[in-house]
Regions:
Chain B
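Membrane-interfacial helix termini and adjacent extracytoplasmic/periplasmic loops
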Residues: 2-3, 40-48, 53, 88-89, ...
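Transmembrane alpha-helices
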Residues: 14-19, 68, 92, 98, ...
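Hydrophobic alpha-helical transmembrane segments of multipass integral membrane proteins
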Residues: 22, 57, 61-73, 77, ...
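C-terminal transmembrane helix and the adjacent membrane-cytosol boundary/short C-terminal tail
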Residues: 11-15, 26, 30, 88, ...
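Interhelical loop and adjacent transmembrane-helix boundary motif
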Residues: 5-6, 43, 50, 209-258
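Transmembrane-helix boundary motif in ABC transporter permease subunits
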Residues: 1-5, 65-97, 109-113, 125, ...
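Membrane-helix interface segments
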Residues: 84-92, 121, 136, 166, ...
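Periplasmic/extracellular loop-to-transmembrane helix junction in inner-membrane transport proteins
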Residues: 2-10, 31-68, 83-86, 232-240
Length: 334, 269
């Protein structure tokens, strides 16, 4: 049992007549396993939110099919899909109390009053909002509103929980707290969860599995470690973190070793141009002493920086760290 | 905030207050004082006059009917304009402002051209079917509805745009049908805009004169509304009744506005 997306294509008409329509999703096929926390990761406008809205039934695909837990949902309206959806800007029902918000899906389903009350109490407890039950959403902070929205979505016991940039509107500190909390919540509830994010750190930290989407296509599917260590292509490599290019090969700036003496096999000579200390790391800008005199970035820890006595105008020799490079895994066909 | 000199503020205040007094407060207060020139005699005399009570009843019927129609169609058109894309949307939006910019007399004449039972475009067919529009209540409701058409829509549309469709989609994904979403999410969301639009439409409908005069035929005791009667009595030197009726119309409008400002929450989040 899982969510199967097969050959989904979605175009949006472009503003202005005569232009080619914008292709948001281009023949996307994907299987999302049950009970896992999956991140759809990619740059803005890459199609990941559109895919999420198509799974939820908030948007219709031009072609292709969506199967949720074995049921063909392609032509089911949103209210029949039993999907919990959490919006970036909370979509709180402003005229209802927090408890009423959470109870909404159950009241629509005409569950007995006692059952609704019990369930709402349990969920508010789960999201730590018990003491706010009678407040209006406008009296809550952003993080609290989003937790309320999550409880509301979980109340209907959805087959799948979909979160569209759920922490995007929150400040950095709350965002970090909430994603740790989401991870723990998922370990308790185990509902199949898909969340959209453009923040690679968020995806790497929270997700069991990451789907990288760019320009309407799936670039790679894998665990956070697989994606980080064995990116399928340069796009994934660049999107998941900072990169540095030596002789046409991409490396992580912290996966390059710096020596102050020559003679290491495969090392290349360079000269330190600038250095920038940021917390525990020092970012070095070095100039390769080859024909092109390219400037690249290398990151070292501050302790390493000190022990080597690195400073501008010092000659150094660079070599990719042994063991950081993993053979590229088989590219995923989109 | 920009700081301004106390003198400038005093001058601005005087100008604004003076302007409002000369234009609004003074004339309206004169209507009130003239109404009560002879104590309550003008009012009691007016209420004893069957033509007056009939005109007031007719005004109430016409105003309430047209407000009800404008409420239903106003909400429908507003949702259509904000939530759906269709060809001709901008044209429809522009057309909705026509009743605000065209003189009510022209509205009345236009309706006459369509619904006149003898020479109208649609009137003879309707007359054959036994439906009389012109020179009867349906025509007056039609004219009043036309004139007050944009008021509900212009209040509701910006609020619908502001609240967006996320809440509606959230309700749908939680299992609500489109009707349940409308009743439980959309309508409560635009509640205050609706109340405000309805009150404006009601005030406008109570006071409509030009369009109603053309389509009603102004038949005393039959198709004469309060505003038409005010004019007629004033022309016929029955000023006390004219003032009393004007006073009642003004009170109705003021009560509407007061109710809204009391009901409306101080600060909507």
């Amino acid at each position: 049992m899982s969510i199967d997306i097969s050959h989904i294509t979605k175009r949006f008409p472009s503003a202005g007549s005569g232009k080619e329509p914008f292709v948001a999703l281009d023949d996307v096929s994907l299987t999302i396993p049950s009970g896992r926390l999956t991140a759809l990761l990619g740059p803005s406008g890459g199609g990941k939110s559109t895919l999420l809205r198509i799974i939820a039934g908030l948007e219709n695909a031009d072609s292709g099919a969506v199967t949720i837990e074995g049921t063909d949902a392609t032509h089911l309206p949103a209210q029949k899909r039993n999907v919990g959806f959490v919006f970036q800007h909370y979509a709180a029902f402003k005229h209802m109390s927090v408890a009423k918000n959470v109870a909404f899906g159950l009241e629509i389903r005409k569950r007995p009053k006692a059952e609704v009350k019990q369930k709402v109490d349990d969920l508010l407890n789960l999201v730590h909002l018990t003491q706010f039950a009678d407040r209006l959403p406008s009296q809550l902070s952003g993080g609290q509103r989003q937790r309320m929205a999550l409880a509301r979505a979980l109340a209907i016991e959805p087959n799948v929980l979909l979160l569209d940039e759920p922490f995007g509107a929150l400040d950095a500190k709350v965002r970090k707290e909430l994603r740790e909390w989401l991870r723990r919540l998922h370990d308790e509830v185990h509902v199949t969860t898909i969340f959209v994010t453009h923040d690679q750190e968020e995806a790497l930290e929270v997700a069991d599995e990451i789907v990288v989407i760019n320009e309407g296509r799936v670039e790679q599917v894998g665990t956070p470690d697989q994606l980080y260590d064995a990116p399928a292509n340069d796009f994934v490599m660049r999107f998941l973190g900072p990169t540095t290019e030596i002789n046409g090969v991409l490396h992580r700036p912290h996966d390059i070793e710096v020596f102050t003496h020559p003679g290491i096999a495969g090392s290349i000579p360079a000269r330190v141009v600038r250095e920038l200390r940021v917390g525990f790391e020092v970012r070095l800008t070095v100039e390769l002493l080859d024909a092109a005199h390219e400037e690249i970035t290398v990151t070292v820890t501050r302790a390493h920086h000190r022990s080597l006595g690195l400073r501008p105008d010092l000659d150094v020799w660079l070599a990719p760290t042994h063991g950081a490079v993993v053979p590229v895994m088989e590219s995923v066909t989109a | 905030m920009v700081r301004s000199s106390p003198l400038l503020r005093l001058v601005l205040r005087t100008v604004v207050v003076g302007y409002l007094v000369l234009l609004v407060a003074w004339p309206v207060s004169l209507v009130v004082t003239h109404t009560f020139d002879g104590g309550f005699s003008a009012l009691s005399k007016a209420f004893a006059d069957p033509e007056v009570t009939h005109a007031l009843q007719l005004t109430a019927i016409v105003a309430l009917s047209s407000v009800a129609i404008n409420l239903v169609f106003g909400v429908t058109i507003s949702i259509l304009l904000v939530r759906y894309e269709f060809p001709g949307k901008r044209l429809l939006s522009a057309l909705l402002d026509v009743p605000l910019s065209v003189s009510p007399v022209v509205v009345g004449l236009a309706l006459l051209l369509v619904y006149n039972p003898r020479s109208g475009w649609l009137g003879p067919a309707l007359a054959d079917a036994g439906v009389q529009i012109i020179f009867s209540t349906p025509g007056m409701v039609l004219a009043t509805t036309f004139v007050a058409l944009p008021l509900v829509i212009r209040e509701v549309v910006p609020v619908l745009e502001e609240i967006g469709d996320d809440q509606e989609w959230a309700a749908r994904s939680l299992g609500a049908s489109s009707f349940q979403t409308l009743r439980r999410i959309t309508l409560p969301g635009v509640k205050w805009a609706l109340v405000y639009g309805v009150v404006l439409a009601l005030a406008r409908s109570l006071g409509e004169y030009g369009a109603v005069k053309v389509v009603s035929g102004n038949v005393v005791g039959s198709t004469q509304t309060a505003t038409l009667l005010v004019d007629q009595r004033y022309q016929n030197f029955d000023q006390p009744t004219a003032y009393a009726l004007s006073f009642l119309l003004a009170v109705a409008s003021v009560v509407c506005i007061v109710i809204v400002s009391v009901l409306r929450p101080k600060q909507e989040a």
